[in-house]
């Protein structure tokens, strides 16, 4: 299944369940068991999420799913100031995209970013079980009221508006739909297709 513009396959390992006031209530592993050789291992689940940015050395946050440095403002990379800067960038992105969205899940996510204190990440009881894996770079996403936040129709529309506004792609004949529209300049990498 091809994702629409602004969406792509993203590996995610943990869901952060938040309350209406933004409080982190629970962390759940969403990893799936996969057979690798003769061993069964836990692997991140691949979900269709807002397209991740291509990172180099700069700070660039992803919308709705990212690692702990961006989502929580803490990681185990040994540079706490950078983690705080990553969190600030992530908070700014979510505030910008969701500022006018009235859905309860959008408001809960905005409350999370307003109230989360990165310096207390290591002490938060909801993170205890998976702390090491989370701080090692596993991707995190959000749940509100039992549902993934990225499935909220209002949030999806807000992301698509933002993505279209940020895209200065030339218009042309689209190969997949046959329609006239903006041509994507960057496509997700094709993975796991054997020797190519």
Question: Where are these predicted regions, by residue range?
Answer:
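Conserved phosphate-interacting/catalytic interface
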Residues: 1-172
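Domain-exit/linker segments immediately C-terminal to small folded modules
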Residues: 179-196
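Short cysteine-rich clusters marking metal-coordination/redox-active sites
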Residues: 174-177
